[in-house]
């Protein structure tokens, strides 16, 4: 199944999905040294996003979150791609400067952690390749 949204940052990535149903703050909510979600209010606290596809409704918090996304990419601890329902400035700028493919306008209620997906940032598409746990 393909979901159509809008591509913000070009690039194609394929991998395991980690889905949060809550907005995510990268500043203080993600450890850039480990790629682990540290926000105690997050429904994916303790999950490692390194090398995975990260999906969540939208970002929240400080604009410094953009630089945390950049730091994740530079340290090799970031996600392969990001999928959001609403790409606000924090996440969009972070993905742009980090070069992480970003697709917005996707209904994340159709996605679940453990799915294998392919993200195409140029076409604005998310393709579900495999359901369930990998």
Curated annotation (Swiss-Prot):
Its Enzyme Commission number?
4.2.1.182
At the top level, the lineage of the source is Archaea
Q: Which GO terms describe its biological process?
A: isopentenyl diphosphate biosynthetic process, mevalonate pathway
* Annotated keywords: Isoprene biosynthesis, Lyase
Q: What reaction(s) does this enzyme catalyze? A: (R)-5-phosphomevalonate = (2E)-3-methyl-5-phosphooxypent-2-enoate + H2O
The subunit structure is:
Heterodimer composed of a large subunit (PMDh-L) and a small subunit (PMDh-S).
Q: What is this protein called?
A: Phosphomevalonate dehydratase small subunit
Q: Which organism is it from?
A: Pyrococcus furiosus (strain ATCC 43587 / DSM 3638 / JCM 8422 / Vc1)
Cite the source lineage.
Archaea, Methanobacteriati, Methanobacteriota, Thermococci, Thermococcales
